[in-house]
Swiss-Prot record:
Residues 28-213 are cytoplasmic. GO terms for cellular component: Golgi apparatus; Golgi membrane. The gene is Ebag9. The coiled coil domain is necessary for the homodimerization. The modification Phosphotyrosine is found at Y94. Residues 1-7 are extracellular. The modification Phosphothreonine is found at T41. Homodimer. It is found in: Golgi apparatus membrane. It comes from Mus musculus (Mouse). May participate in suppression of cell proliferation and induces apoptotic cell death through activation of interleukin-1-beta converting enzyme (ICE)-like proteases. This is Receptor-binding cancer antigen expressed on SiSo cells.
């Protein structure tokens, strides 16, 4: 029984392979026929009537034929020059403010004073000296506030008096600072003694209260 079933299975498999092979051949032949029937034949002739006509192409040498060959300026060369000058004058000068102004510096020349030669009684001329007297006029400055320079007397003790006044002011300030410091210390000591007295009074009151109880 098992042998017959095995033989039937082999026969069925062989038939299935044969049918599948035939089916593939049929499919391939159908595809080839469809491709051969779908071929499109292109026309070999070209219709030039559908092509748009091109415009006439001009040569590049004929472009400037219509251009003017000469330009005539009315009024002559003189009028053109005057017009150009007037236009240049109307244009504002933007760099006018930026031009530097050059000023010459004033030179002060000091001339050397020539030495004066005073005659000696015997007729010979003497030599100049820095201690020799000159003929310059004396300069006297008069002021309404300070008075005449001749009447002003120099006080040599002015600097010493100012130093003494400054030292006295510093001494007064130092003494005042010491007094303020001592006053603050005395105030702190008084407050401390008052606090101590209050603390002792509280202790005494507590002791009296304990004794009465």
């Amino acid at each position: 029984m098992a042998i017959t079933q095995f033989r039937l299975f082999k026969v069925c498999t062989c038939l299935a392979t044969v049918f599948s092979f035939l089916k593939r051949l049929i499919c391939r032949s159908g595809r080839g026929r469809k491709l051969s029937g779908d071929q499109i034949t292109l026309p070999t002739t070209v219709d030039y009537s559908s092509v748009p006509k091109q415009t006439d192409v001009e040569e590049w040498t004929s472009w400037d034929e219509d251009a003017p060959t000469s330009v005539k300026i009315e009024g002559g060369n003189g009028n053109v020059a005057t017009q150009q000058n007037s236009l240049e004058q109307l244009e504002p000068d933007y760099f006018k403010d930026m031009t530097p102004t050059i000023r010459k510096t004033q030179k002060i020349v000091i001339k050397k004073r020539e030495p004066l030669n005073f005659g000696v009684p015997d007729g010979s001329t003497g030599f100049s000296s820095r201690l020799a007297a000159t003929q310059d006029m004396p300069f006297i400055h008069q002021s309404s506030e300070l008075g005449d320079l001749d009447t002003w007397q120099e006080n040599s003790n002015a600097w010493e008096e100012e130093e003494d006044a400054a030292w006295q002011a510093e001494e007064v300030l130092r003494q005042q600072k010491i007094a303020d410091r001592e006053k603050r210390a005395a105030e702190q000591q008084r407050k401390k003694m008052e606090k101590e007295a209050q603390r002792l009074m509280k202790k005494e009151q507590n002791k009296i209260g304990v004794k009465l109880s």
